[in-house]
Amino acid sequence: PDAAFILLRGVAVPLISVALMLVGPLILLPYRRFNDVLDGASFGATSAVAFVGAQVIAQSIDLFGAGLRPGGDSLLWIARLLTHGVALPLVAAGAVGAMCGAFWLRYRAPVRDRSRLGVLGTPLVALLAGAALYVAAVLALLLLREIPALLVVGVLAAAALVWLRMVVHLGLLQESLEIPIGDPIVCSNCHHTTLTHTFCGNCGVALRALPKDARRASVTETAR
């Protein structure tokens, strides 16, 4: 492809796509009930996955005319499916989710937490980094063959998910501070006594993720 095509399809269109992915989540930013970093990360990741999924379906609609077994090397088709159906949505989810998390961190989180992510917690830096990740992924699809493109986009997806994981971790810490510490119970996972809160103080399991029957049994056992 020539330079004009690369600039249009590899840079301009991905940047416009990222902007569209951000519109929905940022509309929710002023609402005070969505005041956690985890809210921003969730909205951004959901918007990105939905957008990329719709985009991939729209761009691939002609492929349905080839039937259930299109011609060509099956390995290359598997690489295409993994790239467009898994790796690229993960890049978008990680990048846009982390970008939205940076906005929530700056404008909704307590002042004490605003430096917890370093420079990546600054909205402008997060925008540039997230856009660069997505543009790099799209350029890899345009310029590389199927298997090298899958490898490159897979590495970018891993980087985006690590970044998103940092944002989610901070959001979970913020939510844990909003929940009061309750009475001692017996953790049904490790059977040690721990205070009623978000996680078991001994084994680290999420107490709210345990089955309700197990939680009731823990309270009953402690009462005895």
Where are these regions (language model features)?
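Hydrophobic alpha-helical segments at protein termini of multi-pass membrane proteins
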Residues: 1-224
